Amino acid sequence: MRVRGALQAAALLASALWASPLLAKDHPDFKTTKLDTQPNNLNYFQGSDTILFHDPHKANLWRSDDAGATWSVVKDIPDGKVARLYMHDFDPKRAFAITDGRKHYRTTDQGKTWKKFEINAEWDTERYDILHFHATDPDRIIFNGLNCLGFLCEEVSLYTIDGFDTPAKPLRPDTLGCWWAKSNALFTTGDSDLDKDRILCIIMGVDSIFTEDRRLVISDDFFKADKEGNIQEFEPNLAGDKPVRGVVNVAAVKRYFMVATTSANTDEMALFISTDTKKWQRAMFPNAHDDHDHKIVQEAYTVLESTNYSIQLNVMTGSKSQPMGIMFTSNYDGTYFTENLEYTNLNMYGHVDFEKIAGIQGIFLVNKVDNGKDVDEKPSTKKKLVSEITFDDGRTFEKVTADGKRIHLHSVTELNNVGRVFSSPAPGLVMANGNTGDYLEDYWDANLYVSDDAGKTWKKALKGPHKYEFGDQGSILVAVRDSKEEDVSEISYSLDHGENWVEEKLPDDLKIQPWILTTTPDSTTLQFVLIGKAKGAWQVIHIDFEALHEATCKDSDMEEWHARVDKDGESTCIMGHTQTFPRRKKDAKCFLKKEFKLAEVETKDCDCTDQDYECDYSFERNDKGNCVSKGPIPIPEGACKDGDKNGKFMGTSGYRKIPGNTCKDTKDTKDKYKDVERSCGDGIGAPPEEATGELQQVDTKGKFGHWTQWEKHYLERGESSSDSSETIIMRGKNRTVDDSGPKAGPIWRTTDHGKTWEKIDFFKDEEVISIVPHPTVKDWVFFLTEGKKLIYTPDRGKRFRTFDVPQPADLEAAANGIFPLIFHPDKPNWLIWLGKKCESKNDCYRVAYGTKDGERWETLARDVYRCEFTGAEAYGRKYANRALEQILCLKHEKEGASDSALQLVSSNDWFNKDEKVRLKDAKEFATMAEFIVVATEDTEKKTLRAHASLDGGLYSEAKFPFGFEVPHQHAYTVLDSSTHAVNLFVATKMEGDKSLGTILKSNSNGTSYVVSVKNVNCDQYFYVDFEKMVGLEGVALVNVVANPDAKSSAPQKLQTKITHNDGAQWAYLPTPSKDEFGRFPCSSSGTEKCALHIQGYTQRRDRGKTYSSEGAVGVMFGWGNVGDSLGPLKDADTFMTTDAGITWKRVKKGRWNWALGDQGSIIVMVPIRGQKTDTLEYSLDQGATWKKHTFSKEKVDIWDLTTTRSGNSQNFLIWGENSDGLFTTKIDFTKFTDHVCKYDPENLGKSDYQIFSPKHPLQPDGCLFGHVSQYLRKKPGLKCFNDFRLDPLYSKQNCTCTRSDFECDFNYELDNHGQCALVKGLKPQDPKLWCKEHPDEIEYYEPTGYRRIPLTTCQGGADFEKQAAVHPCPGHEDDFERKHRISGIAIFFAVVLPVAAASAIGWWVYRNWDGKFGQIRLGEQGASTMEFFDADRPWVKYPVIALSAVVALAGAMPLVLAAIWRTAKNTAQRFGVGGGGRGGWSRLDGGGASRTFRTRDSFARGRGDYTIVDEDEGELLGEESDEEV
């Protein structure tokens, strides 16, 4: 078997030139070449006898120009330099030898000569498409590589239009791969100029390294920049009218361009198709069946060998350990797919048992899993594979038979050769290894079978499995027995289509273990190459059958072979036409000897019949064979535009002609399959019902029973989700102190946001102690039991699967925050399980196990405290040593000694061979964005030390600022940080619930810190009064202790402060204006004596709630009061802001719960729990006006008000209790809208959106962190709704750099004039450290006292870091001298011209000055050379320090997945209080548990807000608040 083409497992070999036979022989000629190492990546130059292969061990290239008879090492390339060989995809004379450096080699004459060329980048060992070729111009090539500085790497793309005759040029920054639009000869944009130049690139998101923010851009002039520096490019509207984020892959398939996208919260991918790169459409798949899904998930789809007229796709279903799939075929446009076959067989690499019969249209072989449903339900079930064949491109399938018996064939998933698996261009000739019987058996029990009618009938050829090839267009078949040993001494060949076989001994009594048997890709020659292993060496055996026959075939030796015939032998139709090939007769004694020329096919179209049609999109065949509707159907463009659901359009009959079928329409088929009249209401994207303004509600009462709390989990959708459902999984629970009474009720599921609820019967006999949604892929939910069984759903509760973990969970550790199940941020199947293993009753320890599929578990480490995945695709691309598989563990130094000190160990290979101790005396660690922060203990001083790492390997100790004295550091809390710096809270005063501390801000590598804000309030568990405004950069609230030095008996005086520039300055909140509820006790713009103060995180009962929503940018709510300090919680009112905290208003007297929907255009409020009500209030204009709605006939106690965390839904859910027990009420606002909002940048008056740009009250230019951000906000009062895939961030424009973009450097602090001055008694940090940390840099600057804020994106302007003297780095003095050498012309421009200009200006001033020296006019400001540094200027008065904000939706990586256990809210012993819909937690223990980490909001986008690292005793936290939810 062989895999040629798509799999690219190895390239193909060629054969020798024909020569006129001088003398007939009765055996082939052999020539043998012995090699020390295994040949790799053998490639023929198309249409020739020239072969190349790569020797990876000695890093050389070998070449043969006589079909493998003789070989020599390529001499033009230095010995030992070749790392990879690439053949040009479209030029049969070109190849490229890539080295490990930046100097590479190319040939344009089939390897005779090689020329060196240089690329200003290194090759990326992890990607295959390093070189991307233009389909029609062989000189146009894109190089996708890397630029690395130490362990920091960035991807780059360069291009050449002259085949590297001149140096390649970079395309644009931040690329993740680029492709020519003309990547396939069949593809065209419809414009020859665009075909020539158009390039598509995947680029990084704006200030983001995360996959879900990546974008696709297109350029037609190589991404050139204009005079202002703007790159000439555009984002294509993949979604029809708007671009789509999260682009992960681009592929050119025949006449189609395919783009795959992903998004947060789901592993589903969206597939967009274009036939010209101008107009794009999302690929549509039919509705899912009951037993399998139709969505495309990450790493779970394979583009099969498609045709010129459709795309064939296999979508994986089932588990990774036992993968299966569904095969689909698209329509002509590639947008609507129909199902061909379910339960196709594939392996864990995505290879599918599928192959087309070469050269014949519509025929392919597949293997399917006959017991697929059983395997899907229980992945440990062994697959039973059967083989089938289709002759109508997948519309129908038949059994494969030999002599009347069914046979099954080994296919692509069991490769044992190179090239195509079954067939070759030899017309109708097919070979395969297989067996008779019910199912496919072991490969080594197979026999060789042959078919000469394109797979219709088969016959047994040779006993045992073989490697095989075709020659001379099928005139000769060659096979060699496959073996596990070096015991093969002969080959077999047949000259009559496999009827008879001749054995031929290998020369010199040679015995080999065969590796590959191959010939030219077109199978037109008589020369073959056999490679095998013998006695520790590799034998390359050239086999030449040229002289077996003297004759060259004549016309009388040829026959017309029809691809398909009827019972009378007459040609019948395949795909609407007959196919006839000229072929040598089976018994003819001759060879064709037509080297590199394929047989020409003759086709003739047939009249259409029913067999030429298949079910169209959204239709399936019923039991009678008719195509019936299974879902909405496509509406033609331009139809149903008037919004009338009862309107009509001409739509599909339910049938379509099979794509690629060329049959001629007849009158009968035209009438039978013509379009029919359809109702607009039945179509995809049917017009919605007219907006009536009616508020709908659905009550669910009396079915949930009596419980003391809810446990509920919203399963958020991703932007790439095709499913529009709003799924919630929930159950009632009792918060019991002892074991009396039931702990939890049945598990319920809704897919329509609470309109209907179904009880999940799967759990009828299961005792689930914890429900845990996957933190980054919300389609997956895990259900933990007390034993070894773990239950999960990969599709939001549609199906459930189980697997066993190696050991039960350590429930005691789980109650203390060590969650047993750890997830990988990118790979939902990758899990770590912390199990409790006991040698005896009193001898138990924790073991970490790892799996990639839930079926096979391996021991990672013993005696561990906890482990975490720290590898991620986003960070692995940036930090070379941070592998995707990287795992960190806290592990006891001595196995078996649980009282021994912990050490931080890491592994980049699941602890197979790589295990390194990184830090000793480790106490805890946390991951936050790209940073890994670790606390270690100084055992002598009994204090903690903080360390940080970017790559998981190198850890540097944190340097705290001078004057920040904490004699004994006992607790750190990692706050929600930006993606470029660490926010670290350090407790400075620990007095129970009167504790406080300082927030410190790091530099870009997490090691050097400056003070951001002091005296920040925290509680005894080191939760901090810190609240970030979700979705905005740099806006955060803190509560500070105004009387930090007061006696412990005195009450704390808390005051709220806000930052709009990431901690550069903090200000009090302004008081609202007088409102309908009366006056406030004072009024001001925000002063120490009078301001608005908001209750902080430590006062919050439900710590899963947030004050803002990621979808409603700039909107925030809070409970608080006006005065000189924060008052009691019971006296608080409800306030809100719509402009990111610049102004506030009171919306309700007293405390109300709120929820935001439709990206903030809908606000719903209800009284808090304990205040019975029958009414809710809502606003459709961001709180300007409010309306009431009575939702209940009786007053009820509302426990919670929820909607989706993203804030994109128009539905809300009230959770409460009435006389019948627990109830839910769905509040539905969909009747208020009837179409999707549109943004029209050309006509803002007609646009449904207005632009909101966050401002800083003291920075009028609007620049925050070096840029101006603009967000879309729906105009009030419109009857449109926001698409849930809408990205609120509309644009971001960089500003020039000013003082605001720099903060004080290490050992510098702000003086009284607002300047960064050196701290008295200290020295600046040694600037030579810059050279040490950046070995490729040639120079360093003396310290200026300033450093660039990590978050800023400013460009140009002032650079405060580089305004002092510059010096060469050690070892780079010559480079420095060359860079700074001054020429004579430079001296002229630098000295002579300025002096002359100064003289001229002085003369002009003397003549025109209208005042005298010393005169100052009223109303004028005196000029000063230091005016820029004037202390009153905002950029001087408020230097940016940058706190903890993140770009909208960036969040932070999961900090400590121990927190997920707390998210579960329950253990077998005790259950806590239910959480909220905006990220509410479930946890194992209701109270009394000592916990190591604190983290909240850790499941938003898979990243958390903050985590405590450690406290004095090694367990940071004390008793947990009973009020925590």
Swiss-Prot record:
<keyword id="KW-1133">Transmembrane helix</keyword>
<feature type="signal peptide">
    <location>
        <begin position="1"/>
        <end position="24"/>
    </location>
</feature>
<comment type="similarity">
    <text>Belongs to the VPS10-related sortilin family.</text>
</comment>
<comment type="function">
    <text>Functions as a sorting receptor in the Golgi compartment required for the intracellular sorting and delivery of soluble vacuolar proteins, like carboxypeptidase Y (CPY) and proteinase A. Executes multiple rounds of sorting by cycling between the late Golgi and a prevacuolar endosome-like compartment.</text>
</comment>
<feature type="repeat" description="BNR 3">
    <location>
        <begin position="449"/>
        <end position="460"/>
    </location>
</feature>
<keyword id="KW-0472">Membrane</keyword>
<feature type="topological domain" description="Cytoplasmic">
    <location>
        <begin position="1406"/>
        <end position="1439"/>
    </location>
</feature>
<keyword id="KW-0677">Repeat</keyword>
<feature type="repeat" description="BNR 7">
    <location>
        <begin position="1178"/>
        <end position="1188"/>
    </location>
</feature>
<feature type="transmembrane region" description="Helical">
    <location>
        <begin position="1440"/>
        <end position="1460"/>
    </location>
</feature>
<feature type="glycosylation site" description="N-linked (GlcNAc...) asparagine">
    <location>
        <position position="1294"/>
    </location>
</feature>
<keyword id="KW-0325">Glycoprotein</keyword>
<keyword id="KW-0812">Transmembrane</keyword>
<feature type="repeat" description="BNR 5">
    <location>
        <begin position="748"/>
        <end position="759"/>
    </location>
</feature>
<dbReference type="InterPro" id="IPR031777">
    <property type="entry name" value="Sortilin_C"/>
</dbReference>
<dbReference type="GO" id="GO:0005829">
    <property type="term" value="C:cytosol"/>
</dbReference>
<feature type="glycosylation site" description="N-linked (GlcNAc...) asparagine">
    <location>
        <position position="308"/>
    </location>
</feature>
<dbReference type="GO" id="GO:0006895">
    <property type="term" value="P:Golgi to endosome transport"/>
</dbReference>
<keyword id="KW-0333">Golgi apparatus</keyword>
<keyword id="KW-0813">Transport</keyword>
<keyword id="KW-0675">Receptor</keyword>
<dbReference type="Pfam" id="PF15902">
    <property type="entry name" value="Sortilin-Vps10"/>
</dbReference>
<feature type="glycosylation site" description="N-linked (GlcNAc...) asparagine">
    <location>
        <position position="734"/>
    </location>
</feature>
<dbReference type="InterPro" id="IPR050310">
    <property type="entry name" value="VPS10-sortilin"/>
</dbReference>
<dbReference type="Pfam" id="PF15901">
    <property type="entry name" value="Sortilin_C"/>
</dbReference>
<dbReference type="GO" id="GO:0006896">
    <property type="term" value="P:Golgi to vacuole transport"/>
</dbReference>
<dbReference type="GO" id="GO:0006623">
    <property type="term" value="P:protein targeting to vacuole"/>
</dbReference>
<feature type="glycosylation site" description="N-linked (GlcNAc...) asparagine">
    <location>
        <position position="1005"/>
    </location>
</feature>
<feature type="repeat" description="BNR 4">
    <location>
        <begin position="493"/>
        <end position="502"/>
    </location>
</feature>
<feature type="repeat" description="BNR 6">
    <location>
        <begin position="1135"/>
        <end position="1145"/>
    </location>
</feature>
<dbReference type="InterPro" id="IPR031778">
    <property type="entry name" value="Sortilin_N"/>
</dbReference>
<dbReference type="InterPro" id="IPR006581">
    <property type="entry name" value="VPS10"/>
</dbReference>
<feature type="repeat" description="BNR 1">
    <location>
        <begin position="62"/>
        <end position="72"/>
    </location>
</feature>
<dbReference type="GO" id="GO:0016020">
    <property type="term" value="C:membrane"/>
</dbReference>
<feature type="topological domain" description="Lumenal">
    <location>
        <begin position="25"/>
        <end position="1384"/>
    </location>
</feature>
<protein>
    <recommendedName>
        <fullName>Vacuolar protein sorting/targeting protein 10</fullName>
    </recommendedName>
</protein>
<dbReference type="InterPro" id="IPR015943">
    <property type="entry name" value="WD40/YVTN_repeat-like_dom_sf"/>
</dbReference>
<feature type="repeat" description="BNR 2">
    <location>
        <begin position="105"/>
        <end position="116"/>
    </location>
</feature>
<keyword id="KW-0732">Signal</keyword>
<feature type="transmembrane region" description="Helical">
    <location>
        <begin position="1385"/>
        <end position="1405"/>
    </location>
</feature>
<dbReference type="GO" id="GO:0005794">
    <property type="term" value="C:Golgi apparatus"/>
</dbReference>
<keyword id="KW-0653">Protein transport</keyword>
